[in-house]
């Protein structure tokens, strides 16, 4: 790892020292009018050891993006990481870490009882053929089983 500070926060994180699953505050940005954007790293798979398969990841993204908004109006975005090991969860004006954990917990429990993947069609999705409700539910189930570990980022 370079000693030089990188512009991208996650590039400065030593991925060999973290222990998934976890939820960590990755950054806070304050807007010109005082709004605070909180970005959380929701790591599901151990970096460089495992990754989510695309259909399951894609469906979990759709489900969490839709269902999380049933629990908060502070959600801005849930974005998958390119490495396929987790998601970025971005909220506005919401800095209560324990509440964020509860929000993720409630959302994942909603995923477990979902009957379909929202917006899983060619009109609403750019790769509608790449989805797996069962895969997303398996990821949610595994993540919830380790709920007590979410606040432990480093091994």
Swiss-Prot record:
InterPro entries: LuxS_sf, Metalloenz_LuxS/M16, S-ribosylhomocysteinase. Gene3D superfamilies: S-ribosylhomocysteinase (LuxS). The keyword Lyase applies. Keywords: Autoinducer synthesis, Iron, Lyase, Metal-binding, Quorum sensing. One of its GO terms (molecular function) is S-ribosylhomocysteine lyase activity. Its EC number is 4.4.1.21. Signal peptide: none annotated. Fe cation binds at residues 58, 62, 125. Its cofactor is Fe cation. The keyword Iron applies. Binds 1 Fe cation per subunit. GO terms for biological process: quorum sensing. Involved in the synthesis of autoinducer 2 (AI-2) which is secreted by bacteria and is used to communicate both the cell density and the metabolic potential of the environment. The regulation of gene expression in response to changes in cell density is called quorum sensing. Catalyzes the transformation of S-ribosylhomocysteine (RHC) to homocysteine (HC) and 4,5-dihydroxy-2,3-pentadione (DPD). Belongs to the LuxS family. Homodimer. This is S-ribosylhomocysteine lyase. The gene is luxS.
């Amino acid at each position: 790892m370079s000693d030089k500070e990188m512009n991208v926060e996650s590039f400065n994180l030593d991925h060999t020292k973290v222990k998934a699953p976890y939820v960590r505050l990755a950054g806070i940005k304050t807007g010109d009018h005082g709004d605070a954007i909180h970005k959380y790293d929701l790591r599901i798979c151990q970096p460089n050891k495992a990754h989510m398969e695309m259909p399951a990841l894609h469906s979990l993204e759709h489900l969490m993006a839709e269902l999380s908004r049933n629990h908060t109006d502070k959600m801005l975005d849930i974005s998958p990481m390119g490495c396929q090991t987790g998601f970025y969860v971005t909220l506005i004006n919401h800095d209560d870490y324990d509440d964020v954990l509860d929000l993720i917990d409630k959302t994942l429990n909603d995923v477990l009882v979902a009957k379909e993947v929202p917006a899983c069609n060619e009109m609403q999705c750019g790769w509608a053929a790449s989805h797996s409700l069962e895969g997303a539910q398996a990821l949610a189930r595994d993540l919830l089983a380790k709920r007590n570990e979410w606040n432990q980022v480093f091994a």
